[in-house]
A protein has these predicted regions:
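Cofactor-binding active-site loop characterized by glycine-rich and histidine/acidic residues
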Residues: 134-264, 285-288, 293, 298-300
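Conserved thiamine diphosphate
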Residues: 232-238, 288-320, 363-389
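Glycine/aspartate-rich loop-and-adjacent alpha/beta segment that forms the canonical ThDP
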Residues: 94, 324-420
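Intrinsically disordered, low-complexity Ser/Thr-rich linker and spacer segments
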Residues: 73-88
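Small cofactor-carrier domains centered on a conserved lysine used for covalent cofactor attachment
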Residues: 1-76
Length: 420
């Protein structure tokens, strides 16, 4: 195992301490060592499941990226983990999903579960690919927020549109982008959804109704409003769902965009994924009224706060919002309360999240809650979960192998897509 490139301005990384000892069995993704850069302390996770046979760097030593730091003996038969052969269980049974199972077909419920699990497992694999050094740049991941993307996009029509942010992998998979085109894009390949020119922060596919992600905070809001205006002028029954984070509501673009949408009664759903943090700053430090949905009243349209970790609650709220838009009632602001299980980006150790806060939110993990509810209320069997998990792993494994062999842009690709 090599020291990953942590994109520091300095050349070396200081190893603070090992979090596992030689001879210890470790799981893929388990924190293995703590390191320090000029930015912050962070943890480096194991790239495989197995036994830590040897450590080759001592604490306080300076380590350049790419140097071998440990030897792992890969375990051929690791025990089942989240997303493995066992159904996920909720640790918060007193907070089940809101809707009744009789209203939904089994195939639909399982499609929601599979899409959420695909997003989670995709993000976990991407994290490991980054640590292995096979993927360049940085990534902003959405583990813990799968229900917001899946719930909203499942309520949209195929010809509806979404705008996204720098944290857009889940939005892309939920809107129908293929696993392969998304992974190819993260590898910078010409077969990626943006021909390798967008990268992690700008994924999208115009043919599938997803504008390439906008990395500027609140940058997608004016674009979504413009699209909604165009659809209204063209008399199309098309809705635009605009994803943004809680930090975006402090930007002028939010005020300008929602004000215009309200004034002209545009078919836009403003989807605020409120995960409580703008980068490392808690929402309570920047807002007196932290209930973001209340802001809609000031512009004269409906706002609603929803449990963003309940995929069915998100789906129902989004379906009603879309119906309101199509009926000509104007925009809707949905505030989806959720929580990211990772740092702002891969270099963020996330030390600012209090342990008790993390524990409380982790107990309400959207995938665990939904799988438990499916087992108890919709009579989904363990075999169903096992089949889904196995299918996802095969898909991801195949996509990774293909992405590693995908063609990279050449000098001849430099001007493609720039003019005309």
């Amino acid at each position: 195992m090599k020291m990953p490139d942590l994109a520091t301005t300095g050349s070396d990384i200081r190893l603070v301490r090992w979090l596992a000892s030689p001879g210890q069995w470790v799981k893929r993704g388990q924190p293995l060592l703590e390191v320090e850069t000029e930015k912050a302390l962070s943890q480096v996770e194991s790239i495989a499941t197995g036994v830590l046979k040897e450590v080759r760097v001592l604490p306080n030593g300076l380590v350049p990226a790419g140097r071998v730091i440990a030897v792992l003996e890969v375990n051929a038969s690791p025990p089942a983990a989240i997303g493995g052969s066992q159904p996920l269980r909720a640790s918060s049974p007193d907070a089940p999903p809101a809707a009744a199972p009789a209203r939904y077909k089994k195939t639909f419920l399982l499609s929601l579960y599979e899409r959420m699990l695909l997003i989670r497992e995709f993000e976990e694999r991407v994290k490991l690919l980054f640590l292995e050094g096979t993927m360049a740049g940085t990534i902003h991941q959405c583990q813990g927020q799968e229900a917001t993307a899946v719930g909203v996009c499942s309520a949209l029509h195929a010809d509806d549109w979404i705008t996204s942010t720098f944290r857009g992998h889940g939005h892309a998979l939920a809107k129908g982008l293929s696993l392969q085109e998304l992974l190819d894009e993260l590898f910078g390949a010409t077969t990626g959804c943006c021909k390798g020119k967008g990268g992690s922060m700008h994924v999208g596919n115009m043919e599938k109704g997803m504008l390439p992600g906008i990395a500027i905070v609140a940058g997608g809001i004016p674009l979504a409003v413009g699209m909604a205006l165009a659809f209204k002028m063209q008399k199309k029954p098309t809705v635009v769902a605009c994803f943004f984070g809680d930090g975006a509501v402090a930007e002028g673009a939010f005020h300008e965009g929602v004000n215009m949408a309200a004034l002209w009664k545009l078919p836009a759903i403003f989807v605020c994924e409120n995960n409580l943090y703008g980068a490392s700053t808690h929402i309570s430090k920047v807002m007196k009224n932290t209930r973001i949905s209340d802001r809609a009243a000031g512009y004269g349209f409906r706002g609603q706060t929803v449990d963003g970790n309940d995929v069915l609650a998100v789906y129902e709220a989004s379906r009603q919002a879309a119906a309101d838009c199509r009926a000509g009632n104007g925009p809707v602001l949905l505030e989806l309360m959720t929580y990211r299980r990772t740092g702002h980006s891969r270099r963020d150790p996330c030390h600012y999240q209090p342990a008790d806060e993390r524990d409380a939110w982790f107990s309400r993990d959207p995938i665990q809650r939904f799988s438990s509810w499916l087992t108890q209320q919709a009579e989904i069997s363990a075999a169903d979960f096992e089949e889904i998990a196995a299918r996802i792993q095969v898909q991801i494994d195949k996509a990774v192998e293909n992405a590693k062999q995908a063609p990279l842009p050449t000098v001849n690709d430099l001007r493609k897509g720039v003019f005309g």
